[in-house]
Amino acid sequence: MSDYEVRPATLRDAKAIAEVHAVAARAAYEGILPEDQLSALAPTTREAKWREAIEFSEPQVQVAEIGGEVVGFVGFDRSRDPKTPSTTGELWAIYVKPEHWGKGVGVALWDAARDGLEEEGCTTVTIWVPLRNERAMRFHELAGFKREMKTAKTTAIGSVKIEEIRLKRSV
């Protein structure tokens, strides 16, 4: 674990973040999304989004790197959900390259996000997770998140509808 460094993202990281996002999302959603939707998860479609997020700190973005290579990232900020108290934060995204799954990178990123949310005055944090993404569900539950069963919603990803549920915990 000590080999990973977590730090705030810079504009130079946008391309690497987009690549991590694409490869990790493709691995996470294989079997959940059809091939044409997985193919649409290309880094080129995400780089501008992450560049803008880093530039304007919305969301705040931290990266995990080893040997100068970005292997994971987390985006977090105040909750985007309507009618949510200003003390509620949200993990907007947390992705790690599949070859680094289970090695503590996600935990290090979550710790950095929790520290950042605490600095922002957040007392609780949420994340939306597709019900069929068992790996993500397990990760967040091991990190202390609890399912809010009354929050289930359907989100369209391209032509596919995905059932999501919000998880929540104290910061």
Enumerate the predicted regions with their spans.
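Acetyl-CoA-dependent GNAT
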Residues: 4, 8-12, 22-32, 36-99, ...
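Hydrophobic pocket/interface hotspot
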Residues: 17
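Conserved glycine-rich acetyl-CoA-binding loop
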Residues: 93-111, 118-120, 130-138, 142
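Alpha-helix N-cap/helix-start and coil->helix boundary motif
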Residues: 11-14, 133-134
